[in-house]
Amino acid sequence: MSIDRRSFIAGTAAVAAQFGFASRVYAEDKIVRFTIAQDFTRIYTFVTSEYNQGQRDYFALVNERGGVGGYKIVADVTDHANDLPRAIEAYERGKREGAVLIDPLSTPVARALVPRALEDKINMITAYSGRSDAADGTAFPYVLPLSINYWTQAGLIIENFKKTEKGSLKGKKIVFVHIDTPFGKEPLSILQVLAQKEGFELLTFPYTPPGNDQSAIWPQVRRARPDFVIFWGAGVGQTVALTEAIRNGLPMDRVSSSVWLSESDMDVVGRDAAKGVMKVEPCVGGREPKVIKDILAEVVAKGKGAGPEAKVGTAYYNYGVQMGALMVEGVRLAAAKAPNGPVTGPWLNDGLRSITNFTAEGLLPPTTVTREDHQGGGMGRIARWDGAKFVPVTDWFAANQDVVWSEIKKNSETFKTTGK
């Protein structure tokens, strides 16, 4: 997939219009500009392509309907390839062009950009990535996960395991297989606290990124005879981990992932072989949500979709719609407060931090973002793969938020003091 510096002005056939040209064509429109600099070519690949497709299709839907609050959405899409110099270049270019938001969809990139976003007052969206302590809006006013962070996801998984064991994990053995990066290591602190609190034994097995070869790890996991397994990665690491878990005979109904597992992963692993595996689900999957049906009817059917129609409704696609909808809701609220702008980072920030009980017409659990809580409430659910789709096995719920917020506050206070 080749992605270069483009402006995607959703709702037109000119989705590949060059950046400057697009700006001139729409000079008569009031616009809000987003920098969508993501990794299309190195590690996250199809994760990014589906997520980005969902975002752009949602922006197209909004613009086809005339925009939001009198504004059109302009999304400048570029490939940073998970490379910090390229990501910083994209960030700085967006800043020069008036972007008020960036979505890098990468933990190392998001971590590197935190000081710039805070200093420049440009809203950085860190959906399912970045620093978990960015949920503390008092420490990170311009870093907004708008989604359940790593720590919350780990807490949800453990709570579901506990429910499976009829309310007690005492004496149980839980294995955590993870990519050996900050993203992969981040849940460890919460898992360690919960191991002490709930009385289970935690065994950890890191693997070298990107995770192409995990053959030495999974026989060790099998020999450990765990009661449950959590595997934690993204992109190729996830499919390799799941393939090895199956090969080593681990029962899929005792294996769970974070949010980073999708239908595309199942196609690689084998849809039938993976039956029973679980994941954290942050929004509704499939094509039943009203907003997905609207995209199909008003964007895709008109030939204005941003990618293959077959990907519409996949997990990663719907994550992109989810985050696009939250961004646009922030614009709507900002425009309601100050219809004539000026469109700045603080202007949008005021809107994003006013989101209240937002569900995108049933796509996501009720989400409320405040100046204190940038996570949005901490709700998710557990879904199980049935061979064709992920089927929810719980309602939306929050779990272990006392432990999660204790960790958030501990780390955010350190950031306030040291900047690290």
PLM features: what roles do these ranges have?
Residues M1-G20:
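N-terminal secretory signal peptides and thylakoid transit peptides that target proteins
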Residues I31, F46-Q53, R65-G137, L146, ...:
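Beta-alpha junction/loop-to-helix N-cap segments that form part of ligand/metal-binding clefts
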